[in-house]
């Protein structure tokens, strides 16, 4: 990939289509979540899921924080031909360590402070138990979801945006099938 002398259009569309595809897949499986829960639990289920959504979004954002931040520095160092003294893999390692720390802190916060967090995000006495039941599986996959976001960013910046999109697609399919199995 030669960004200085090559044709930028195919490179741009390769990355654009992968990013757009990932965003669309994420949007679709979020809608499927809401639709299935709404069909099974009704308005209270949808409201409880809306209370849990900010927790999920924060974990997603922490994964993006480590992934995008680390992968941009990784790519910058990789692209600098004059500065080979720093190994770009060090930045990947730092992102992994940072993700482990953030996953552990997030996991501990949600395990020990789940009720106050849900109340902060709008749960009331009628929604709290339902929101807690939706949050239970989230507790189990916090590290996986955070690492998925972090690794997808590194894959994109390591010239493999199609692998990042494939991982998002696999997660989306698992989510839709899991919704059907676990909700109904």
What feature does the model see in each segment?
Residues 18-39, 46:
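Extracytoplasmic
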Residues 46-108, 145-164:
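Small-residue-rich hydrophobic transmembrane alpha-helices
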């Amino acid at each position: 990939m030669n960004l200085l002398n090559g044709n930028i259009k195919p490179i741009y569309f390769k990355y654009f289509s992968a990013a757009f595809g990932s965003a669309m897949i994420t949007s679709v499986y979020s809608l499927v979540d809401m639709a299935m829960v709404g069909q099974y639990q009704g308005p209270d289920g949808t409201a409880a899921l809306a209370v849990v959504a900010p927790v999920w979004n924060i974990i997603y954002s922490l994964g993006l924080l480590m992934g995008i931040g680390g992968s941009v520095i990784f790519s910058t160092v990789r692209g600098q031909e004059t500065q080979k003294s720093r190994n770009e893999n060090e930045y990947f390692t730092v992102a992994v360590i940072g993700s482990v720390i953030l996953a552990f802190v997030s996991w501990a916060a949600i395990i020990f402070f789940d009720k106050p967090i849900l109340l902060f995000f709008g749960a009331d006495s009628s929604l709290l138990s339902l929101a807690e039941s939706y949050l239970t599986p989230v507790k189990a996959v916090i590290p996986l979801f955070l690492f998925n976001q972090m690794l997808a960013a590194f894959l994109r910046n390591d010239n493999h945006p199609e692998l990042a999109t494939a991982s998002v697609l696999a997660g989306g399919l698992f989510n839709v099938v899991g919704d059907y199995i676990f909700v109904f």
